[in-house]
Amino acid sequence: MKKPVNVAMVGLGFGAEFIPIYQAHPDAKVHAICRRNEAELNKAGDTFGIDQRYTEYEQVLADPEVDFVHINSPIPDHGKMTLQALDAGKHVMCTVPMSTSIEECEQIVDKVKTTGLKYMMAETVVYSREFLFVKEMYDKGEMGKIQYLSASHPQDMDGWPEYWEHMIPMHYATHVVSPVLGLTNSKAEYVSCFGSGTVREDIQKKSGNKFAVETCHIKLLDSDLSAHIWRFLYDTARQYRESIDVYGSKKSFEWTLTEDGKHVVHTAKKPEPEIPELVEVPDYAHLLPEPIRKFTQSIEDADHLSFVQGGGHGGSHPHMVNEMVSALVEDRDPWPNAVTSANWTCVGICAHQSALKGGEIVRLPEFTLK
């Protein structure tokens, strides 16, 4: 593909954090921005010096200069907006999850296959410095044989936009699914999930879900490994956390219990008091083009008053931008591609189905295993 690659940013709440990263990337250009609220749209356009501004998504898709759309819309719109973009001949990067229905996930996978367009689910966890640290240890053989993986994402969503009250915990599970599958580049074959506890009645009515917590075991395809994940959204006391614990034959990694703590690496065959070591996880900005390395850390931008850029989600944002832009320039699939994104997303959908059936095993759809 030609350089620079023209991106249209769709959704400018969380999405606005990506604009300066694209603007600094040597192979990308923010061609257009889209937001329904015209006042907020113009504010963002003026702040970042972007002239092409749209209040309607259909206007973005009709613009022949747009190469790909970066979708940051509310979760219920992800599948529909992705399919619209693919139908319009646009490549897509979309924030998580891919969809909340297996049917839409399959439609996206099929459409990517038939059109040859690129799709990437913008999963932050697998580009966070913590995941990259564990992945580096694993790839170097320092962890030995992986024996078990576990991940958690407790988060109290009271006070967030109202549509969250309609969500089911495992329908927003890619932050825990992706690291336990992504570390060994595996896919999930089947799941068994239990619901636990109950949320208050108004949440039950809106979401159709009674479970406060959903806890799931995942069997990895063509592997002797299983992984354990759990989620909650309401009515359970716990500080926000997106964690991954990885247990190997030589070394293991455990996530800190609290936000201000340090992660722990355990090394086998040492005297018992010496097995655990508190570690400082390094930054991985060196993997990025120099102009966007600064965005792995939080920075105050003097040109954009009070706007804090970079550093979000473990420094993952510039890595995701670089992956999508590089995939388009190099004409290769981004990671995660459509099939992998569907597998990660459908784990959560299948997990909730399992919970409704008392933990019955539910197999992942065949289209996610290819």
Q: What are the functions of these language-model segments?
A:
Residues 1-48:
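N-terminal Rossmann-like dinucleotide-binding module
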Residues 68-75, 79-126, 141:
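Beta-strand-loop-alpha-helix segment that lines the small-molecule cofactor/substrate pocket
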Residues 89, 116, 141, 224, ...:
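Glycine-centered short loops/turns at secondary-structure junctions
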Residues 158-241, 245, 339:
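Rossmann-like dinucleotide-binding domain that binds NAD(P)(H)
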